[in-house]
Amino acid sequence: MAKIVVALGGNALGKSPQEQLKLVKNTAKSLVGLITKGHEIVISHGNGPQVGSINLGLNYAAEHNQGPAFPFAECGAMSQAYIGYQLQESLQNELHSIGMDKQVVTLVTQVEVDENDPAFNNPSKPIGLFYNKEEAEQIQKEKGFTFVEDAGRGYRRVVPSPQPISIIELESIKTLIKNDTLVIAAGGGGIPVIREQHDGFKGIDAVIDKDKTSALLGANIQCDQLIILTAIDYVYINFNTENQQPLKTTNVDELKRYIDENQFAKGSMLPKIEAAISFIENNPKGSVLITSLNELDAALEGKVGTVIKK
């Protein structure tokens, strides 16, 4: 039996609640399949599109005197509940359908960051909708947002993405796992908080990369494998070119060379690779699998996906 952290990509979860629910139902079958094979899993998820849409909608309401503006920490908490609810419900239904009595819990999770992290001066985490160049430039002029081109898919707003330091609810996660509970935690990389005097915490405007928090979670609970599910089947070098090549198996040293060659796009694949390296360096016996949500079953059979080891 292996202990596995499964990190679901926010972009792979669809663009609407309806699309997300449909995708999540299919994902639940694959995740429950891992459980029936005897594996112990913990689930995390991204929230880039979702938290951006929540923030955009609430800000629109505030600008039209229909409600207050909400900080990003609160928007992150909302996205954890929204995505976690759909995952939790789908997993509960799938477990019930096969006669398995197992509790599923979504844990609102805070993650400590450093308020002096240089990321706060260099926004890099894409969130929200995709825009063409003209739309992005217009919004940037009107609202002062920062936009970047995102892996050939269009332009997206970027926000600070500080490094995760510690998971505040870690002991609660461990307790739930020990009691045979299927845990959904660290959604969207966790709600970013900074430490104040007397060990208090306060939310801060940022979005933590979910793969980096998932790697931290995996190392903290000493899991055997980190599975990162995204929108593509493999990690590629020369991505989106005529000579792009999938990496089927690779290692930390090779990935570091590819990083030096700027093979991985900032804000999309690069954080996943950095998370994989971090996980393996903190857990040398572990491995990382990166593939698409749709190909999870095939990837678990070794037919597709990128496997990373030390």
Curated annotation (Swiss-Prot):
Question: A biological process (GO) annotation for this entry?
Answer: arginine deiminase pathway
Q: Which keywords are on file for this protein?
A: Arginine metabolism, ATP-binding, Cytoplasm, Kinase, Nucleotide-binding, Transferase
Q: Name one GO cellular component term.
A: cytosol
Domain of life of the organism in this record? Bacteria
Task: Name the principal localization, coarsely classed.
Answer: cytoplasm
Q: Name one GO molecular function term.
A: ATP binding
Cross-referenced SUPFAM superfamilies? Carbamate kinase-like
- Pathway the protein contributes to: Metabolic intermediate metabolism; carbamoyl phosphate degradation; CO(2) and NH(3) from carbamoyl phosphate: step 1/1
Instruction: Write down the InterPro entries for this protein, in alphabetical order.
Output: AceGlu_kinase-like_sf (IPR036393), Asp/Glu/Uridylate_kinase (IPR001048), Carb_kinase (IPR003964)
Query: Can you name the source organism?
Result: Staphylococcus aureus (strain MRSA252)
| Protein name in UniProt | Carbamate kinase 1
Regarding protein family, the annotation reads: Belongs to the carbamate kinase family.
EC number(s) on file: 2.7.2.2
Question: Which catalytic reaction applies to this protein?
Answer: hydrogencarbonate + NH4(+) + ATP = carbamoyl phosphate + ADP + H2O + H(+)
Q: What class of enzyme is it?
A: transferase
Places the protein is found: Cytoplasm
Which gene is transcribed and translated to give this protein?
Answer: arcC1
